Amino acid sequence: MNQVMTIFLVLGVIVYSVESSLTPSSDIPWEKCRHDCFAKYMSCQMSDSCHNKPSCRQCQVTYAICVSTGCP
């Protein structure tokens, strides 16, 4: 079950990345907010702290909280 969630999250990240690169950048606040949250998520995933599954799970949780509470 956890692997399935991870696969869907990774696919979502890939789709979001492709969509972000294909669409012209806009000044819509929620798009910028989601982009900022995603940038933080990618930074977390690439960091040394994400060397085991629990640490990487925290990156996912932090991203979800960022989007749900910080973006309009």
Swiss-Prot record:
Secreted keyword on record: yes
One Gene Ontology MF term: toxin activity
Top-level taxon in the UniProt lineage: Eukaryota
Paired cysteines (S-S): C33-C71, C37-C66, C44-C59, C50-C56
Record's keyword annotation contains Secreted: yes
Signal peptide: 1-20
Location in or out of the cell: Secreted; Nematocyst
Expression tissues: Expressed by acrorhagi.
Keywords in alphabetical order: Disulfide bond, Metal-binding, Nematocyst, Secreted, Signal, Toxin
Parts forming coiled coils: none
Major place of residence: secreted
GO cellular component terms, semicolon-separated: extracellular region; nematocyst
Miscellaneous: This toxin interacts with divalent metal ions (zinc and nickel). This suggests it may function as a metal ion chelator to regulate metal ion levels or as a metal ion transporter, or that its function is modulated by metal ions. Both Thr-23-Pro-24 and Cys-71-Pro-72 are in the trans conformation.
Family: Belongs to the Acrorhagin I family.
Domain topic, free-text comment: Has the structural arrangement of two alpha-helices stabilized by disulfide bonds (CSalpha/alpha 4(S-S)).
Cited function: Toxin that is lethal to crab. It interacts with divalent metal ions (zinc and nickel) suggesting it may function as a metal ion chelator to regulate metal ion levels or as a metal ion transporter, or that its function is modulated by metal ions. Is not active against any of the voltage-gated potassium and sodium channels tested. In addition, it does not show activity in bacterial and fungal growth inhibitory assays as well as in hemolytic assays.
Protein name, UniProt field: U-actitoxin-Aeq5b
